[in-house]
């Protein structure tokens, strides 16, 4: 039945989200975190929730299995886009719009893609400086930290990946014929990518 299927989707999502939270705690402050480990955390912690929500929408609407899977994939890719943009905003956003200080996630030990990428690209002197800044980021150090992220294309790399996941989310919609909902979902994908808070 649909109820049982929905319960299975929710149970799986809840389990993966809990595992994602545990992985995030295990990796807190780990400046050797890899891109693959980062994506495992955000997939489990964030993307799986959006995937489940979209899949459940498909189940409730009586979508055929292929469309249900397409909705699940759309949600997964939207979740990855959302988290990547969130991580970019942690380093570039406006404090008033975000409601938190620039670098707040980093100060809480969350190592995210922009820093992972910059550390991987930097030579030893800049790598050492990035590590110093990351371990004790004070407000007056934020401009230097942002400059190092920019120097190594870290924010552009994260934006590029967010764009790729947005396109994948949009591709998932190709299975659906023309309808207002498809248009709305396309708009949502673009708004998620362009958000500033």
Regions found by a protein language model. Give the residues of each.
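All-alpha prenyltransferase/terpene-synthase fold signal
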Residues: 1-197
